[in-house]
């Protein structure tokens, strides 16, 4: 069962990305290093509710 999740930057709080994840195999919140346009560099993005 894939669900749509939003990724928010940990430094600015901006919600820059929307992706999908499989809740059965990844029940915990995902964390990815993605590009932040406001900071113009890669930062850690966490899944938000």
UniProtKB/Swiss-Prot annotation:
InterPro entries: Ribosomal_bL33, Ribosomal_bL33_CS, Ribosomal_bL33_sf, Ribosomal_zn-bd. GO terms for molecular function: structural constituent of ribosome. The keyword Glycoprotein does not apply. GO terms for cellular component: cytoplasm; ribonucleoprotein complex; ribosome. This is Large ribosomal subunit protein bL33B. Keywords: Ribonucleoprotein, Ribosomal protein. It comes from Shouchella clausii (strain KSM-K16). GO terms for biological process: translation. It comes from the Bacteria. Coiled coil: none annotated. Belongs to the bacterial ribosomal protein bL33 family.
């Amino acid at each position: 069962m894939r669900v749509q999740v939003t990724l928010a930057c940990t430094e600015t709080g901006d919600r820059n990305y929307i992706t999908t994840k499989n809740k059965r195999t990844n029940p915990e919140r995902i964390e990815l290093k993605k590009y932040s346009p406001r900071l113009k560099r890669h930062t850690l993005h966490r899944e938000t509710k």
